[in-house]
Amino acid sequence: MTTILKHLPAGQRIGIAFSGGLDTSAALLWMRQKGAVPYAYTANLGQPDEDDYEAIPRRAMEYGAENARLIDCRKQLVTEGIAAIQCGAFHNTTGGLTYFNTTPLGRAVTGTMLVAAMKEDGVNIWGDGSTYKGNDIERFYRYGLLTNAELQIYKPWLDTDFINELGGRHEMSEFMIACGFDYKMSVEKAYSTDSNILGATHEAKDLEFLNSSVKIVNPIMGVKFWDEEVKIPAEEVSVRFEQGHPVALNGKTLSNDVEMMLEANRIGGRHGLGMSDQIENRIIEAKSRGIYEAPGMALLHIAYERLLTGIHNEDTIEQYHAHGRQLGRLLYQGRWFDSQALMLRDSLQRWVASQVTGEVTLELRRGNDYSILNTVSDNLTYKPERLTMEKGDSVFSPDDRIGQLTMRNLDITDTREKLYGYAQSGLLVTSSATGLPQVGSLEKSKVAE
């Protein structure tokens, strides 16, 4: 069976991920006119720039959908977002600022939940608005086929017939008007935006040029913290975790995880927390640039990692970062539910997140400027009395440290001998300008002493 259909399968049911925007509206109407039977599926992902979700399926029916459904994906999306925080599943960072993989998380949930809904309706052909140059075409392909092994893919934007007739936004708008729908194109922004409850992605158009900065972006989840005219008073906030799960903000327990994320977004958004400018590597290895918002994810991540570093030992923290980065890349590639990702995720949640219990108090200021004011946890292995510089009972003595340092002589001697060997073979050039000017002049016998 051919998985990808290059031309419209007339007479067959086609599920389309319907956003209500011009592209998917024109595509749905065009498919109906060409003889297909379109079914519209809209994901409620808690998009901060969407005012009326209930109106979207109604518009789909007006444009010719056989049926239109609104699928509430918010609970599952927040669940996956919290899991990503627990695992540190983020691999794109610049100057200490993190991209929280909010779009890949959204695609994992959308791709599985919408295709599952289509399968319930006997719809086994799926179309969406992703283009052939981006990441989403592969993410949706993977998640769709994972959910329904019988799935076929039809994308109007890969169909030459559709492109020849309605290849641009102007043509789509004229098509809608000619068909009796007073559809006016929205005012073109200098960039495109994709969002969900976890975060927003701004990219393309003017943002493709690196001399266009964050200053051209109008945040939809926060404030323009770079604008000095925007007043942003400092705010103290506390975040509490129990076994790796955020349970309270400012001492208030929220009714569910969705409300928790919404409140975290409101708090972080008041300061512009979690905005970052990233150059990343797409799945096809071409670089792209995006400006991201994720105020709630950032707030929870900061508090979570503060507790984690005070609770776990160095080797565990090292594995958390290494495995989290690996997991983040798998998530970015559309492999969040692959076996290798599940293996990493399970170990990080089981052995790392389960011990992260406590409360962190922060002062938020402008943008990503904040201070940690207090960290409290019964699980802390940070114990100041162990290393105090004041007199008193100590867990180890000066003689203990002398013995420990003496044992280091073994590997120091081995290292010195290897450096000598490197210098003798010419691999290590020593001179007065290097940090090891004396190595090359050492006698072999002295090195071995």
UniProtKB/Swiss-Prot annotation:
Q: Please list the GO biological process terms of this entry.
A: argininosuccinate metabolic process; L-arginine biosynthetic process; urea cycle
List the Pfam families hit by this protein, alphabetically.
Answer: Arginosuc_syn_C, Arginosuc_synth
Identify the domain of life: Bacteria
Where found in the cell? Cytoplasm
- InterPro entries to which the protein is assigned, alphabetical: Arg_succ_synth_type2_subfam, Arginosuc_syn_C, Arginosuc_syn_N, Arginosuc_synth, Arginosuc_synth_CS, Arginosuc_synth_type_1_subfam, AS_cat/multimer_dom_body, AS_multimer_C_tail
Locate the residues binding ATP: 17-25, 43, 129, 131, 136, 194
Q: Which reaction does it catalyse?
A: L-citrulline + L-aspartate + ATP = 2-(N(omega)-L-arginino)succinate + AMP + diphosphate + H(+)
Q: Could you tell me which pathway this protein works in? A: Amino-acid biosynthesis; L-arginine biosynthesis; L-arginine from L-ornithine and carbamoyl phosphate: step 2/3
GO molecular function annotations of the record: argininosuccinate synthase activity; ATP binding; protein homodimerization activity
**Root EC class:** ligase
Binding-site list for L-aspartate: 131, 135-136
Binding of L-citrulline: at which residues? 99, 135, 139, 192, 201, 203, 280
Question: What cellular component GO annotations does this protein have?
Answer: cytoplasm
- UniProt record similarity statement: Belongs to the argininosuccinate synthase family. Type 2 subfamily.
NCBIfam families to which the protein is assigned, alphabetical = argG, PRK05370.1
Name under which the protein is recorded: Argininosuccinate synthase
Species annotation:
Salmonella arizonae (strain ATCC BAA-731 / CDC346-86 / RSK2980)
